[in-house]
Amino acid sequence: METKGRRSAAVLDQQDESEAHPRKRPTRRAPLHRDGNNPDSDAATMEGSDPGSAGRPSSDSLLQEPSQPAKRGGLLDRDAIEHITELWDRLELLQQTLSKMPMADGLKPLKNFSSLQELLSLGGERLLTDLVRENIHVREMMNEVAPLLREDGSCRSLNYHLQPVIGVIYGPTGCGKSQLLRNLLSSQLITPAPETVFFIAPQVDMIPPSELKAWEMQICEGNYAPGPQGTFIPQSGTLRPKFIKMAYDDLTQEHNYDVSDPRNVFARAAAHGPIAIIMDECMENLGGHKGVSKFFHAFPSKLHDKFPKCTGYTVLVVLHNMNPRRDLGGNIANLKIQSKMHIISPRMHPSQLNRFVNTYTKGLPVAISLLLKDIVQHHALRPCYDWVIYNTTPEQEALQWSHLHPRDGLMPMYLNIQSHLYRVLEKIHRVLNDRNRWSRAYRARKIK
């Protein structure tokens, strides 16, 4: 009994001592929370102060770093300045070109920074970030079209194996339409190379012998490509393509529409490989009553289905007038609707050229449409036998409008990129307009 009483008294003395000194706690106490994975390990209590914190801090304690100001994301690092500089050069060139056009009077003037240094210093974080993003997008558009171009920047082909190839050539007399037709085949701009070429004329006797010989030589030239060690590689299944001259009346015979008729000359040629039909000087015949529009839409699909070797079908038609009045059978109207390529000489009448540009540039800004008209007018003053080509179904959007030059080749105009750059100029114009409006409002309130 004495032992039990002494123990209870000792416990009471410890409780009184802890109540008298609330800062002092027993060195060992059951923890409030234990580790679920290690329930037997001793954990430090959550109640009271740490007796070790009063002295020297332990070497294992973590020191918090002082708060740093928020970083701005490297806005004007080297890459950002490179993007802005590259975009500024393009914007400045486009704006100078638009301002010097003869038709620039109707365009609204766009405000811009006077120099690159002013843009970098006064542009602001949001505008500069947008410009970096816009230039990245321009680079992406350039990289998308790069695989379709040669090393010198010219196009590898007109159709890039798109079938069928229905093309219309517009040009006045003496602009080089016949030479253009031969060049398209000899330079392999139309792929695949045809194995049989049908030359359609109003009368066979009106074709001069020199032109026939030129056709035979150039289609044979287009059938080969240079290979390694001075060799030549055939581009089709024949060593010598066939050249067949036909009169327009023979073309329109009924048996030439039926692919199952053994008398069909086109079906016999398509059984061996790709074919091409060239209609030169046939505008008056096309404007007659007899319809030949089957050659533009129904006939190609029938040939492709019946003859697997006919991997290419090309029809090129020459017109001296972009809007002929005589079209009794609707052949010319159907031809222009089904056409995949419109090849235009800059020497055409300006009113017809402007009407065509206005029709096929509805989705472009007005300034870019005027720029295209100025380009055509510029080449019309220089008789270089060059051509402007509009592709209704291009392989890439940058190739929709292109320029064919005897020396430079087929060069894309990149009107989609020019339209994008013009919209960037409009964005800068809106930013500067907003700043001027805010400045005027601030001054007006300050005066009041």
UniProtKB/Swiss-Prot annotation:
<dbReference type="InterPro" id="IPR003389">
    <property type="entry name" value="Adeno_IVa2"/>
</dbReference>
<dbReference type="InterPro" id="IPR003593">
    <property type="entry name" value="AAA+_ATPase"/>
</dbReference>
<keyword id="KW-0804">Transcription</keyword>
<dbReference type="InterPro" id="IPR027417">
    <property type="entry name" value="P-loop_NTPase"/>
</dbReference>
<keyword id="KW-0231">Viral genome packaging</keyword>
<feature type="region of interest" description="DNA-binding">
    <location>
        <begin position="440"/>
        <end position="448"/>
    </location>
</feature>
<dbReference type="GO" id="GO:0016887">
    <property type="term" value="F:ATP hydrolysis activity"/>
</dbReference>
<protein>
    <recommendedName>
        <fullName>Packaging protein 1</fullName>
    </recommendedName>
</protein>
<feature type="binding site">
    <location>
        <begin position="171"/>
        <end position="178"/>
    </location>
    <ligand>
        <name>ATP</name>
    </ligand>
</feature>
<dbReference type="GO" id="GO:0006351">
    <property type="term" value="P:DNA-templated transcription"/>
</dbReference>
<dbReference type="GO" id="GO:0003677">
    <property type="term" value="F:DNA binding"/>
</dbReference>
<feature type="compositionally biased region" description="Basic residues">
    <location>
        <begin position="22"/>
        <end position="31"/>
    </location>
</feature>
<keyword id="KW-0547">Nucleotide-binding</keyword>
<dbReference type="GO" id="GO:0044423">
    <property type="term" value="C:virion component"/>
</dbReference>
<keyword id="KW-0067">ATP-binding</keyword>
<comment type="similarity">
    <text>Belongs to the adenoviridae packaging protein 1 family.</text>
</comment>
<keyword id="KW-1188">Viral release from host cell</keyword>
<feature type="compositionally biased region" description="Polar residues">
    <location>
        <begin position="56"/>
        <end position="67"/>
    </location>
</feature>
<comment type="subunit">
    <text>Homodimer. Part of a genome packaging complex composed of packaging proteins 1, 2 and 3; this complex specifically binds to the packaging sequence on the left end of viral genomic DNA and performs packaging of the viral genome. Interacts with protein 33K.</text>
</comment>
<dbReference type="GO" id="GO:0039708">
    <property type="term" value="P:nuclear capsid assembly"/>
</dbReference>
<keyword id="KW-0805">Transcription regulation</keyword>
<keyword id="KW-0010">Activator</keyword>
<dbReference type="Pfam" id="PF02456">
    <property type="entry name" value="Adeno_IVa2"/>
</dbReference>
<dbReference type="GO" id="GO:0044095">
    <property type="term" value="C:host cell nucleoplasm"/>
</dbReference>
<feature type="region of interest" description="Disordered">
    <location>
        <begin position="1"/>
        <end position="76"/>
    </location>
</feature>
<keyword id="KW-0238">DNA-binding</keyword>
<dbReference type="GO" id="GO:0019083">
    <property type="term" value="P:viral transcription"/>
</dbReference>
<dbReference type="GO" id="GO:0044196">
    <property type="term" value="C:host cell nucleolus"/>
</dbReference>
<dbReference type="GO" id="GO:0019076">
    <property type="term" value="P:viral release from host cell"/>
</dbReference>
<keyword id="KW-0597">Phosphoprotein</keyword>
<dbReference type="GO" id="GO:0006355">
    <property type="term" value="P:regulation of DNA-templated transcription"/>
</dbReference>
<keyword id="KW-0946">Virion</keyword>
<keyword id="KW-1048">Host nucleus</keyword>
<dbReference type="GO" id="GO:0005524">
    <property type="term" value="F:ATP binding"/>
</dbReference>
<dbReference type="GO" id="GO:0098035">
    <property type="term" value="P:viral DNA genome packaging via site-specific sequence recognition"/>
</dbReference>
<comment type="function">
    <text>Component of the packaging machinery which encapsidates the viral DNA into preformed capsids and transcriptional activator of the viral major late promoter (MLP). Binds, along with packaging proteins 2 and 3, to the specific packaging sequence on the left end of viral genomic DNA and displays ATPase activity thereby providing the power stroke of the packaging machinery. The activity of packaging protein IVa2 is stimulated by protein 33K which acts as a terminase. May be the protein that pumps DNA into the capsid powered by ATP hydrolysis.</text>
</comment>
